[in-house]
């Protein structure tokens, strides 16, 4: 007996399909050929449904085009940290040698986790909370990542507002951070760089503490000199508030109609950075000292691989650079067609992310080499990470170029677009996660989106006060550090162990027609959870309180930071306790309903619980 499948349209001349008035979606004809002994072949045919989601009946929006989804994922994953953090870590940790642990962790943990989130969202077609129908007791993980994305929105939008402020300030014949003759400059400001002149007060980059660029950022934009600390914030600055309003308006109109609108916005925001990076690279490599900077970036010191800090930096960079754990990948992939090849998407997008991080290092260090030669200092004196790189050092380098205003406009447009699509992803995670969980919100998406963006705007106002940089630093340090690593760890355990890597692989095969290989199943089951556990433990053991330059945060501020961090992590045990207590029956029955997928409810009713068998936990 042999079986073959073909579409109804192609078989219309051979088989007349039965009509089903209420049938939804395309059908397939299954032909069964039976060869009898007399040589006569008889055929029978039946109509079968093609692969479809368990929730296919729901009227769920999908991406207008496949490229909309890919650009959205790439735009979210490739953010400002690709420009300001990876190149610095590579330089700091042995240059090209750093790529060894980075690529290793990317292959054994980063890609598998990325693939897992895409498949999880696409199969279940719900946001970060709704997907936990696969293990109801762990739905708190969904609320953890939603809350983290909301926290990040409170301060991430401020970075975009800074970039917008710089962009507006660049439309002049002379950039405002070139000289020390402005109203915001202090008597200590000096156009001439001095390698040891930067110890006079707080700053992102002590070496550049008294340059016009540093004073423009800290005194002209932030007005940090008018604050004595986090307990002396002062009023919001109207210029930054206006920029923040523009950012919020842009985010709202990009998100209010769902992926149909955001999928079009990313055509600009996700592609523009690559155009600008290419232009900056072509300009940077022609500058004097650029080769020295690139040589410093790529210099290989394999002895550094013997240091634990190098491996720790590589592990944390992999975790944060891909954007797993924010619920964004789950939200985006939930709008895919059910049969979309999420495996290929995972490979393509993670590869593009890593290549972007690596190539941006050539752009950054060509300019840093130029700055080092210009001021006759070692590259280590100008090689920094964080906001100081893109708002102090890079603007100062651009200011020395011919047509500096034009280059500044180009650079800050890149920062603006890098930030916008990442912020859109974070907001979409919150919106999709909650409207899928609460159907009342689903019917009023536009109003709920307005509520979310207004809430983030109001809380972001604390970050645009005179002392707002202290609030920004506190949130940046606590909101998405250990908490997001914890969330991803529980997520990996929930999918691979409680739901089962075998069942998860069956789901992927149902979608794509291809079962994940043993490599991916081993990574999900063993390697990725162990990797995440290692990173969580290391992040706790190596924790250092936040600081901004010479400013040390008071104890109450650090306590507030831990409240922020633990508030998101607490969603896991709080919801688990609520779910367990709300279920009827004995302890065993409660446990069965809590850890078994909702689709297995009938099996649980009959006492057939996969999770109560040893085979389930050992299966790979």
Swiss-Prot record:
Annotated GO CC locations: axon terminus; cell surface; flotillin complex; neuron projection; neuronal cell body
Annotated site residues (Contributes to high-affinity binding to cocaine) in this chain: 105
Extracellular topological intervals: 172-236, 288-306, 377-400, 543-553
Positions bound to chloride: 317, 321, 357
Cellular location(s): Cell membrane; Cell projection, Neuron projection; Cell projection, Axon
Quaternary structure and partners: Monomer. Homooligomer; disulfide-linked. Interacts with PRKCABP and TGFB1I1. Interacts (via N-terminus) with SYNGR3 (via N-terminus). Interacts with SLC18A2. Interacts with TOR1A (ATP-bound); TOR1A regulates SLC6A3 subcellular location. Interacts with alpha-synuclein/SNCA. Interacts with SEPTIN4.
Membrane-topology descriptor: Multi-pass membrane protein
General remark: This protein is the target of psychomotor stimulants such as amphetamines or cocaine.
GN (gene name): SLC6A3
Family in the record: Belongs to the sodium:neurotransmitter symporter (SNF) (TC 2.A.22) family. SLC6A3 subfamily.
Transmembrane segments: 57-95, 96-127, 128-171, 237-256, 257-287, 307-335, 336-376, 401-442, 443-466, 467-499, 517-542, 554-583
Regulation of catalytic or functional activity: Inhibited by zinc ions.
Provenance organism: Macaca fascicularis
Biological process according to GO: adenohypophysis development; amino acid transport; cognition; dopamine biosynthetic process; dopamine catabolic process; dopamine transport; hyaloid vascular plexus regression; lactation
Residue ranges of the region described as Interaction with TGFB1I1: 561-590
Domain of life: Eukaryota
One Pfam family hit: SNF
CDD domains associated with the record: SLC6sbd_DAT1
Role played: Mediates sodium- and chloride-dependent transport of dopamine. Also mediates sodium- and chloride-dependent transport of norepinephrine (also known as noradrenaline). Regulator of light-dependent retinal hyaloid vessel regression, downstream of OPN5 signaling.
Any one GO molecular function term: dopamine binding
Protein name: Sodium-dependent dopamine transporter
Positions annotated with a glycan in the UniProt record: 181, 188, 205
Catalytic reactions of this protein: dopamine(out) + chloride(out) + Na(+)(out) = dopamine(in) + chloride(in) + Na(+)(in); (R)-noradrenaline(out) + chloride(out) + Na(+)(out) = (R)-noradrenaline(in) + chloride(in) + Na(+)(in); dopamine(out) + chloride(out) + 2 Na(+)(out) = dopamine(in) + chloride(in) + 2 Na(+)(in)
Residues engaged in binding Na(+) 2: 77, 79, 82, 321, 353
